[in-house]
Swiss-Prot record:
Disulfide bonds: none annotated. The active site is at residue 313. GO terms for molecular function: nicotinate-nucleotide-dimethylbenzimidazole phosphoribosyltransferase activity. InterPro entries: Nict_dMeBzImd_PRibTrfase, Nict_dMeBzImd_PRibTrfase_bact, Nict_dMeBzImd_PRibTrfase_N, Nict_dMeBzImd_PRibTrfase_sf. The keyword Transferase applies. CDD domains: DMB-PRT_CobT. It comes from the Bacteria. This is Nicotinate-nucleotide--dimethylbenzimidazole phosphoribosyltransferase. Its EC number is 2.4.2.21. Catalyzes the synthesis of alpha-ribazole-5'-phosphate from nicotinate mononucleotide (NAMN) and 5,6-dimethylbenzimidazole (DMB).
Length: 346
């Protein structure tokens, strides 16, 4: 299987970074989370003057066999319809990407549709038709999981080679909140009932049905419970690609902007495999999907925004980017007390 070499950022520069932040013209700590972000980014980049370059939002897309059990309000064909909307620039994340200067990369990891050759669509289809139905069998084979991890990592390598040092991950795949709930309950031991939500808009009866399907799936699972086995048995190709992408981004010392419930569960899996990767993560928002706050708490993560979002696509992480930008501008553009000839007042 693909291996990554991920080290936590060297903290040798921490004192100098903190001193620079503390000596900007403000009361110590008065810019709160911006100061913590500036310190984190400075450590990731190992510099007193960090920069953000060429932000990219990568959207991995695939269909899920479990969707055949009616665990989503939307039918499978919505996945490919939304892909077309991405390509036409009309989706929610598209206007946010335009607003905040992100390049969008759309990756077909296993959508149940034969797209024609489209220059803007990156074809990395692991299996035609998407994953298998994990109510009855593993969603993917070991070989397919390894291929998805590699494909996800390769996309990030391309972004890095194009000058990107801050990357957001989004997803599209009907049924992927169900898959994420399975990852969450298996790897956190949080009861399944607390991991299952409305997804794309199920009513209470729909959520109950979704829970019952997932409960049966959990009862049928006979694996070893390891992160790799749980990822393979219940995951979507787009989710496994995101895990591979996140791990490669951490290996390359890029800043990882984490989106919603699904991407946070991808961090859960990735950090179980390589705990140091979480040092590179900035959690964009706490969404409205049941379980999101619980998995953030499990990871010890504090999200930047709480706007009731549950769209996915990377929309929440792209929304949070200006806060990260403000933190970097703070450490680079604010004057020190000495520069401003102001008496240090703390």
């Amino acid at each position: 299987m693909i291996q990554f070499h991920i080290e936590a950022p060297d903290k040798g520069l921490e004192a100098a970074l903190q001193d620079k932040i503390d000596n900007l013209t403000k009361p110590k700590g008065s810019l709160g989370t911006l100061e913590a972000l500036a310190l984190q980014v400075g450590l990731i980049q190992q510099t007193l003057s960090p920069v953000l370059r060429h932000p990219v939002n990568v959207i991995y897309a695939s269909d899920h066999g479990i969707a055949d059990e009616g665990v989503s309000k939307s039918p499978k064909e919505v996945t490919r319809q939304v892909i077309h909307n991405f390509l036409n620039g009309g989706a929610g994340v598209c206007y946010l990407a335009r607003q905040h200067g992100f390049e969008l990369k759309i990756v077909d990891g296993g959508v149940d549709f034969d797209f024609p050759v489209i220059p803007q669509l990156i074809d990395r289809k692991v299996r035609k038709g998407g994953t298998r139905n994990f109510l009855h069998e593993a969603a993917m084979t070991v070989e397919e999981m390894e291929k998805a991890l590699q494909y996800g990592a390769d996309i990030v390598t391309d972004c890095y080679n194009e000058g990107c040092n801050v990357i957001s991950f989004g997803e599209m795949g009907i049924g992927n909140t169900a898959a994420s709930s399975m990852w969450m309950t298996c790897l956190t031991q949080i009861p399944l009932i607390d991991c299952v939500g409305a997804g794309s808009g199920l009513d209470s009866e729909g959520v109950r049905h979704k829970y019952n399907v997932l409960k049966r799936s959990l009862e049928n699972y006979k694996g070893d419970g390891s992160a790799l086995d749980v990822m393979r048995y219940f995951g979507g190709y787009e989710m496994v690609m995101a895990v591979g992408g996140m791990l490669r981004a951490a290996e390359l010392k890029m800043i990882i902007l984490v989106d919603g419930f699904i991407m946070t569960n991808c961090v859960l899996v990735a950090s179980r495999l390589y705990p140091e990767m979480q040092s590179y993560c900035v959690f964009g928002h706490c969404g409205d999907e049941a379980g999101h706050k619980r998995v953030l708490d499990f990871l010890g993560a504090k999200a930047l925004l709480d706007l009731g979002l549950r769209l996915g696509e990377g929309s929440g992480s792209v929304c949070a980017y200006p806060i990260l930008d403000s933190a970097v501008r703070m450490i680079n553009e604010m004057h020190s007390f000495k520069q401003a000839a102001i008496t240090k007042y703390f």
